[in-house]
């Protein structure tokens, strides 16, 4: 597999940083530009170069955990330990993938010299001290995010090596789709993705819209996955989504999203927009906003993806 220049740079930066006694590396790249590949290769290099080295990949959800597990199994015959709910990684596992929630109570299993790969590290927020404590428990941390702007994330990586791929450069290199921000129009498929403010709003809108479905917080996981698969298969053209759900249902063919709720969270805005930015030849991502203020908020959030903000050491 041929790597893109920003992936090569990330691997080189990590290799240099990992010669130190302690390191923080932050990789900020737009959605769909290969952060999973970066994480997998860094993990494999770490265990290959250290006879007793261990890696924990910390993820935010079960679908993302499964994505990482598939990628690592393509690269190694080493057993992959899983920390998720009732699943526990054996103490002999050198490659471990863990959900944040499960890792909280199992940190004692992992010495400080374990490499932590913190996927979607914007979750390391000061308002979520348990998430921040995860990263502070390790001497070496690689953080990956398109939006590393939460206060906790900025604190954790304030003195860090940093690799950044600006959004406009990713568009120019055809790594992500070009985008347009447009006034609201009635959602239409195929593969329409509509973000709303709550489960109730999603359920009500879906009930009024023929051939649509919805997913939300606290919807059982199996039911949620079944609905996503129906949407991907074209059985339902429109998927209404609680805006708190931002991971685990990527679909590169998704051409447009609708944002029906203003939010002050630039992290959330970029994560929602990112669902439509996956590259396909000829694709233009159209991002529809319910209000003029929402359009301006989204423009400001995406523009923030074009400038680094944290100190490089």
Task: Locate predicted features.
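Conserved segment of the helicase C-terminal RecA-like domain
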Residues: 275-302
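A short beta-strand element within the Helicase C-terminal
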Residues: 113-114, 238-242, 247-263, 268-271, ...
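Conserved pre-motif I regulatory segment
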Residues: 1-28
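Walker A/P-loop
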Residues: 20-42
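Conserved helicase ATPase core of P-loop NTP-dependent helicases/translocases
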Residues: 81-90, 212-245
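Conserved helix-turn-beta segment of the N-terminal RecA-like "Helicase ATP-binding" lobe
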Residues: 52, 62-86
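Conserved strand-helix element at the start of the C-terminal RecA-like helicase core
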Residues: 55-65, 187-208
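Post-DEXD/H (motif II) to motif III coupling segment of the RecA-like Helicase ATP-binding lobe
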Residues: 122-179
């Amino acid at each position: 597999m041929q790597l893109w220049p920003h992936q090569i740079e990330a691997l080189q930066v990590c290799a240099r940083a990992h010669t130190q006694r302690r390191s923080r590396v932050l990789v900020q790249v737009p959605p769909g530009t290969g952060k999973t590949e970066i994480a997998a290769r860094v993990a494999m290099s770490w265990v290959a170069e250290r006879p007793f080295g261990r890696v924990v990949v910390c993820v935010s959800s079960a679908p993302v955990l499964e994505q990482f597990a598939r990628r690592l199994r393509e690269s190694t015959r080493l057993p992959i330990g899983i920390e998720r709910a009732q699943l526990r990684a054996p103490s002999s596992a050198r490659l471990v993938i863990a959900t944040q929630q499960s890792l909280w109570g199992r940190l004692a299993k992992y010495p400080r010299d374990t490499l932590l790969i913190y996927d979607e590290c914007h979750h390391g927020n000061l308002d979520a001290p348990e998430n921040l404590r995860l990263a502070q428990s390790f001497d070496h941390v690689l953080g990956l995010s398109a939006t590393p702007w939460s206060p906790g994330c900025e604190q954790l990586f304030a003195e860090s090596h940093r690799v950044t791929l600006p959004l406009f450069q990713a568009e120019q290199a055809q790594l992500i789709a070009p985008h347009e921000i447009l006034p609201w129009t009635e959602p239409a498929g195929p593969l329409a993705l509509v973000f709303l403010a709550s489960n109730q709003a999603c359920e009500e809108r879906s009930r009024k819209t023929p051939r649509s479905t919805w997913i939300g917080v606290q919807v059982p996981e199996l039911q949620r996955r079944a609905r996503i698969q129906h949407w991907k298969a074209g059985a339902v053209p429109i998927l209404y989504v609680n805006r708190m759900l931002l991971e685990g249902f990527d679909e590169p063919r998704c051409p447009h999203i609708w944002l029906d709720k203003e939010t002050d969270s630039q992290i959330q805005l970029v994560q929602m927009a990112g669902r439509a930015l996956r590259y396909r030849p000829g694709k233009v991502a159209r991002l529809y906003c319910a209000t003029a203020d929402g359009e301006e908020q989204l423009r400001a959030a995406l523009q923030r993806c074009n400038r680094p903000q944290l100190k490089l050491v």
